[in-house]
Structures are given as C-alpha cells and as structure tokens.
Regions:
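A ligand-binding cleft/hinge motif common to bilobed small-molecule-binding domains
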Residues: 116-125, 242-256
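Secretory targeting signatures
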Residues: 1-24
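A short, structured surface patch at a secondary-structure boundary
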Residues: 47-105, 109-115, 216
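Proline-aspartate-enriched helix->loop->beta-strand connector
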Residues: 98-112, 228-245
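Extracytoplasmic substrate-binding proteins
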Residues: 26-27, 36-38, 118-196, 217-219, ...
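Structural recognition of the beta-strand scaffold that forms the well-ordered cores
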Residues: 45-48, 65-68, 109-113, 130-134, ...
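Short helix-initiation/N-cap motifs at beta->coil->alpha
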Residues: 32-34, 88-100, 136, 220-229
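Alpha-helical, coiled-coil/dimerization segments enriched in small aliphatic residues
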Residues: 197-224
Length: 293
C-alpha cells in the first residue's frame, strides 16, 4: 500500500520541479557601470539601496529582505508600510554598506547606485550579485522601472505607472508649449551645496525642460558640478529650485549677500523641493509641482 502512495507523490514532486525549472529564467542586464549582470528570475530576496520607492508601487514587500537606512525616513514608504523599521532590516546605505548585515540576509540581488564603484566591487568580492543604477533621463528611468518589473513579474504594473506618468508629463507639456521660447525662464537646480548645480545629465535637467524652463547649467555635460558664485551670478537664473535633502533652506539664499544680485533672489522665486524621490513614479508629481511655480 505504501508503494502505491509513494509513486504518485514522487510524480507530483517531479512535475513540480519541472514546472519550476520551466518558469525559471535568466536575463542579462547591462548596468550603469557597463557591467553585464546575469539575473535569475524571479528574484525572491532583494536588497534595495536605491529605487526603493518603486517597491511601494509594485507591492513586492515580500521580496524585499533589506533596505537603505534612508528608506526609514521616506514619507511614502512610511505611509504604505508603517512597520518598515520593524520588518525590513537596514543594511546601511550606498555610501556605507553594513556588509555583515547584508551577508546575513542572503540576498539574490542587491540594487544600488553607480556613484560608488569601489563599494560595488567590494560587495561582489563577497559573492553578492549587484546591479548599479543611475538613470540620467526620464527614458533611462523607464528602463530601470521596466527592469524591476521583470525582476518581480510585475511588468503590467510598471507599464501602468509609466502610462500615468506620461499623462502628467503630457498635461504639463501642453501648458508649457504655449510659452514662447523668448519668454521661458532660466531655471537652476541646486544640490547639497549652494553652488552645486545640476548639469545636462540627469532627470533634474529633464524636469526643468518639462516645466517649461531653460537650464543655463546644461552647458556642463555633467550630472552635477560645483561652480563658482560668479558663474551663478552670470547665469542670473529667474527661478531656483533646491534639492529637498539639502541642509540649507530658501531663507539662507535670500539672506546671503553673495546671492543678492540674482534675479530669482530679488523676486523671491526660490523654492525647496519636497523630499520626493526622482527615481520613482513620483518624478511626475515633482514635475507638476515645479511647473506650478
């Protein structure tokens, strides 16, 4: 009797294994550092140092085993997953990885940014599979979003997000196209330092263009760069946006004698952005916020 029971059980187990193998897939992704990374799908254990806001849109919390400590202060993540601090361990950040904590989590994939290649090499030496991202345009952001859709089998959700983002961008574009080129404002985006400006590369430059502005710092073919105060004064921007994570505020620029000759200061057209991610679907909301200024 036991033999008759064991036989069908063995067949079921064999069929399950065959189905699992058939569903398994490997994709090759060339990341921002030019590395070709082979990734086995579906990813079941992932650590996010970056692009963690996208997990909220995709609803893949059961696949996230570790996260950047900065995620603990993210308003979106705290709203959709109030228990994030208790349920998802921090593994440091892309700047300072806690390698012991990371290895304990046994991730199948680590998603980080390309800013720190040495840290990426260090993680790889420890046997971890790492993808380095740094979207430098809206088009590249869409590529990153589609990659994560593939990783977790959420392609339809990603396309839905992209469709909604495009609708917002189209709405902004329709309004801004009515402004003649000669009347478009010069707009700069400041980073962590008061003289750190966003150049031609990066989503910030795309945001300025979408909002109907002209980025004079786009002559710099960089993501961001420290420039002299004299150069900022020469650009004489009409509007200034400050990165939401900067340690200084609008009042600091308005009170500075160095900035007093800049048009944006005189007209009080200086705004500090909300701390919303620009490597996520919330980029569209940031663009809308900028266009309304």
């Amino acid at each position: 009797m036991e033999k008759w029971i064991a036989a069908p059980v063995a067949v079921i187990l064999l069929l399950t294994a065959l189905v699992s193998a058939a569903c398994a897939e490997t994709i090759t992704f060339q990341d921002k550092l030019g590395r070709r990374v082979n990734i086995h799908l579906p990813v079941r254990r992932a650590v996010f140092f970056e692009t963690y806001e996208l997990t909220a849109a995709l609803g893949v919390w059961d696949r996230v085993v570790g996260i950047s400590r900065y995620a603990y202060a993210n308003d979106l993540l705290l709203a959709v997953k109030p228990d994030i601090v208790r349920t998802i361990p921090s593994v440091g950040s892309g700047f300072d990885v806690n390698i012991e904590a990371l290895l304990r989590l046994r991730p199948e994939l680590v998603v980080t940014w390309a800013f720190n290649p040495e840290t990426i090499r260090f993680m790889e030496e420890k046997g971890l599979k790492v993808v380095a991202l740094y979207p430098e345009s809206i088009a590249e952001l869409y590529e990153v979003m589609r990659l994560q859709g593939r990783l977790f089998g959420k392609e339809k959700k990603v396309e839905s997000c992209i469709d909604r983002m495009n609708k917002i961008f189209f709405l902004i574009g329709e309004r801004c196209r009515k402004v003649p080129p000669q009347k478009r404002k010069k707009v700069i985006w400041l980073g962590g330092k008061q003289t750190s400006v966003s150049g031609a590369k990066g989503v910030n430059n795309d945001l300025i263009g979408l909002a109907g502005g002209i980025n004079p710092a786009a002559v710099l073919k960089e993501r961001s760069l420290d420039v002299s105060m004299e150069r900022v004064v020469a650009w004489n921007p009409d509007v200034i946006f400050i990165w939401g994570g900067a340690k200084y505020n609008v009042s600091d620029l308005l009170a500075s004698s160095q900035w007093r000759h800049v048009t944006a200061i005189g007209k009080k057209q200086v705004y500090k952005a909300p701390q919303w991610g620009t490597w996520s679907p919330r980029l569209a909301v940031v663009a809308l916020w900028m266009a309304m200024k």
